[in-house]
Amino acid sequence: MTQRITIDNLSCLCSSIVSKNKIAYTLYPLDKLCDWIEQAAEKYGVTIVAITGMDWQNVFSPWPAPGVPKGEPDFEGESPEFLRLLQSKVIPQIETSLQMCSNVERNLVGVSMSGLFALWQWMICDTFKSIASLSGSFWYEGFIDWMKTAHIPHKAGMGFFLLGDQESKSNVKAFASVGVDTDAILSLLKSAGVKIKFDSVPGNHFANPIPRLNMAFSALYPDNSLE
């Protein structure tokens, strides 16, 4: 049975405790995930926590940048603060409440701006072993340059990336570069010896959310084993 935990205005929807050794956090703008997280938790043998209620444009932006498309509010660059909130409060409270093991394997799934956040935080810390970035906003100003100059660390886990085949056809110039930008990210990670998997799927940015989430979990938990 799912349960909902509220932490600092964040709504954390938790699946049944399928595993105390594996937990996956999703940063996904869908409030009605109750049925899916229960089914996915059982299928993939992992306890799932879906976090919503974030200031989407700002907490997932790693540094301040002009708004996109032109005329939209600027991004405020609050990712460092949000990461600290996850590390210091959200994750400890969730995992204490769910009685997770002290050495729990922790993964992160994000989409769009939270997919950008998933990769950004993976490059600077080991809070999450593996990540999935679905249609990650790698067009974000300065991100490719940051990846090119950053030290890409050894990662024990893997990164799964997915992009819709219509996303590069956006009328917004910045968004239209996402295909090239994603290719650049994949090349940089592969050159650094990071284990990656990429899938191109039909559709635009937010098409078919549940099938895409299932693809991410299939990549992160390929053995489908139950603890």
Residue spans for each PLM region:
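The feature captures the conserved acid-bearing segment of alpha/beta-hydrolase catalytic domains
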Residues: 138-221
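A conserved amphipathic alpha-helix that caps or lines the catalytic cleft of carbohydrate-
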Residues: 41, 121-122, 186
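Short glycine-enriched nucleophile-adjacent loop
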Residues: 115-125
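Alpha/beta-hydrolase fold nucleophile elbow
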Residues: 99-111, 131
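Serine-hydrolase catalytic machinery in alpha/beta-hydrolase-like enzymes
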Residues: 11-13, 19-99
